[in-house]
């Protein structure tokens, strides 16, 4: 018997990487999963996971799409039990150079999108509780960059800081209904974005020099935490961000010092 038997989940950004790993693990634990992604590759991803998965093309920053994907998920079994807010993008530019449009684009996906789908999903979950059904669970994807800034990742760092606070606000608002909301803060995970860095030995060395465990994590390791948070094993945990970073945030490391 799986930890998520009979549950219906939405995983945004589920076409690849961490989102796909979470979708795969949820299905292995007995859940039905709706992969919500703007990437049409989500269709093939869902097909690869079998009959327990379906794909709904979703722009998380569009309110209409947020309502649609929740309705589609409820069409699977009548209820929505789990939402994983995983969709996210980056834009690399220095603070002095980044354009307003690029800043807005990242915030729209990473933070506003999480709010939009989170609110629609939460309203559905509250209605289910009022109907005498079990409370749902929401898992938001944060990052160590909610706590540790990178100079050329301005909107990403800002958005993830916002995710941590949004998670707390959601948790407090929904606790009276028994609905739990937590976040996961990954460190260096072997996604498509990081694979390019991992093949550059100098870049990989810099990455590992600030990772005490000395390796890059696999997306399945994030999926394990997402499964725990969605399950009854985490029944008294809400409003928390669990950092999965190989010890990165515990490390107090030095920076280069200019000569006198």
Where are these regions (language model features)?
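Substrate-binding pocket helix/loop in short-chain dehydrogenase/reductase
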Residues: 94-95, 99-107, 207
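Active-site loop immediately N-terminal to the catalytic Tyr-X3-Lys motif
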Residues: 96, 148-154, 176, 214, ...
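Residue(s) in the substrate-gating loop at a strand-loop-helix junction
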Residues: 143
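Alpha-helical segment proximal to the catalytic Tyr-Lys
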Residues: 123, 172-176, 235
């Amino acid at each position: 018997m799986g930890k998520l038997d009979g549950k219906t989940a939405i995983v945004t950004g589920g076409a690849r990487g961490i989102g796909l790993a979470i979708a795969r693990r949820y299905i292995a634990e007995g859940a039905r999963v709706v992969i919500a992604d703007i990437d049409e590759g989500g269709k093939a991803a869902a097909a690869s996971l079998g009959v327990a998965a379906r794909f709904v093309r979703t722009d998380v920053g569009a309110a209409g799409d947020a309502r649609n994907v929740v309705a589609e998920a409820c069409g699977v079994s009548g209820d929505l039990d789990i939402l994983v807010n995983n969709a996210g993008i980056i834009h690399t530019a220095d603070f002095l150079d980044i354009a307003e449009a690029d800043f807005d684009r990242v915030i729209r996906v990473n933070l506003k999108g999480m709010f939009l789908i989170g609110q629609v999903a939460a309203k559905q979950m509250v209605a289910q509780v009022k109907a005498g059904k079990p409370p749902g669970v929401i898992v938001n994807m944060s990052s160590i960059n909610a706590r540790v800034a990178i100079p050329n990742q301005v909107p990403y760092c800002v958005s993830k800081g916002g995710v941590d606070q949004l998670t707390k606000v959601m948790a407090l608002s929904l606790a009276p209904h028994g609905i739990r909301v937590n976040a996961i803060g990954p460190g260096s995970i072997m996604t498509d974005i990081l694979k390019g860095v991992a093949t550059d030995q100098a870049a990989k060395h810099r990455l590992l020099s600030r990772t005490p465990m000395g390796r890059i994590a696999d997306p399945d390791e994030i999926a394990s935490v997402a499964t725990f948070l969605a399950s009854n094993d985490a029944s008294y945990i809400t409003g928390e961000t669990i950092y999965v970073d190989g010890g990165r945030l515990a490390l107090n490391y030095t920076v280069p010092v200019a000569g006198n």
